[in-house]
Amino acid sequence: MTRKEVVLAVTAATITAVAAGVLMGRWIRRKERRLKHTQRILRKFARECATPVSKLWAVADALVADMTASLTAECCGSLNMLVSFTGSLPSGDEKGVHYGVNLRGKELLLLRGTLGGNEEPISDVQKHEIPIPDDVLNGSFKELCDFISLELVKFLAMNPGGEAEEVKNLGFTLTRSVEQIGSHSISSIHRKSLANDDDEKVLKDLVNDMNESLETHGLKIRMNTALVDNTIGELAGGRYYHKDTVAAVSLGMGTNAAYIEQAQEISRWKSAIREPQEIVVSTEWGDFRSCHLPITEFDASLDAESLNPGHRIFEKMVSGRYLGEIVRRVLLKMSEESALFGDTLPPKLTIPYILWSPDMAAMHQDISEERETVNKKLKEVFGIMDSTLAAREVVVEVCDVVAERAARLAGAGIVGMIKKLGRLEKKMSIVIVEGGLYDHYRVFRNYLHSSVWEMLGDELSDHVVIEHSHGGSAAGALFLAACGDGHQDSESK
């Protein structure tokens, strides 16, 4: 090779190296710019979701105001609370075998359990989950009653023993995921507030339909309590174990809270309530809305595109049905504006409600160095096969912001209920919490507990005890069955 050729080769190599260096520098700078933009989106989102103690108290006070308004006026505030005439709650002395039914969306859960009295734990709990056929879902309530009765016959045949000659009580609860199922659907019946005689008659007719069906199928089981939200069943379970149980909260796919109110505080339904009497109230707090709620652009777009825009605002911020969707929307914006997952937008990231709260919880609670669970879930859920560690860290941070806000708002709701009862400084108050978010999402649960402690401080926080539900999912129906005296009985006395 001649001297000239050598010079040309060296020059070409130098130019190539310089060009490669320039391109590499541009790539690095572009990557840094994208990461900075991602961080800006994250910081803005976290700032808008922030729930300092002052914000939590503002939310709690607004909830108290709406609860008070709902008890005194027909249309005032964001809540339309429901009074549940479940009769006397358990005392802890109840004994024997009891039966329960829990209607949860398109599924039916049948239960049987034994209470030993003396506040002994429920035992021998047997459960059987059954899908409800579409024709039954879209049929009349009588058709649903016949389906339930037939399945109860099978359930007892599969689980023999414990039957007696006397008629047993049946508790019937509805989980928040219940959907509209026909013109006489459970979901529409559940929202009856017993505000007038027609509504009361509807509920009595439902109980009668169920009992007629049970008798027709030869079952020595009768429904003596009204159809109630599952949260009220959990409250009954809490009362069985401790007389200081005053409220119950459901934090699963949906959310609700129920508490025990004094009859003299309820003027809206005064003609239907005899005093003195403790009344169980379903707050329907999923409908709660307030200017103090930390609503972001992602919450606003989720609500606008939902099937019920403008409604269930609190539920859309705290329940398992929506938390994963909020995370998805944030990640989508990051992917569109800062190429979080590369230059090509992952198609599945654009699919609404593809990310469920269990997957979100798994990513959030991943403590491995390489965020291996996050990597696995990104592949499984979104089809993102090649994510960087930095991107996976961002995913965890987004999950943390969403979960922390939800849990702390739920904690503020709990404090608000206790404040409404005037028990913050005076008495021990036990609140039962049930649902997948609380039961299986450890970080969410910790955030909820810490928010209550932060709001109340060392001294007052000792007065509020938060406990898991008793007997497992939907066991509240069994405790309602143990109550014995239901709405029908109380009306006939």
Curated annotation (Swiss-Prot):
It is found in: Membrane. It is a single-pass membrane protein. SUPFAM superfamilies: Actin-like ATPase domain. It catalyses: a D-hexose + ATP = a D-hexose 6-phosphate + ADP + H(+); D-fructose + ATP = D-fructose 6-phosphate + ADP + H(+); D-glucose + ATP = D-glucose 6-phosphate + ADP + H(+). The chain crosses the membrane at residues 5-25. Residues 229-471 are annotated as: Hexokinase large subdomain. Residues 36-482 form the Hexokinase domain. D-glucose binds at residues 193, 256, 284, 315. Coiled coil: none annotated. It comes from the Eukaryota. PANTHER family: HEXOKINASE, HEXOKINASE-LIKE 2 PROTEIN-RELATED. Belongs to the hexokinase family. This is Probable hexokinase-like 2 protein. It comes from Arabidopsis thaliana (Mouse-ear cress).
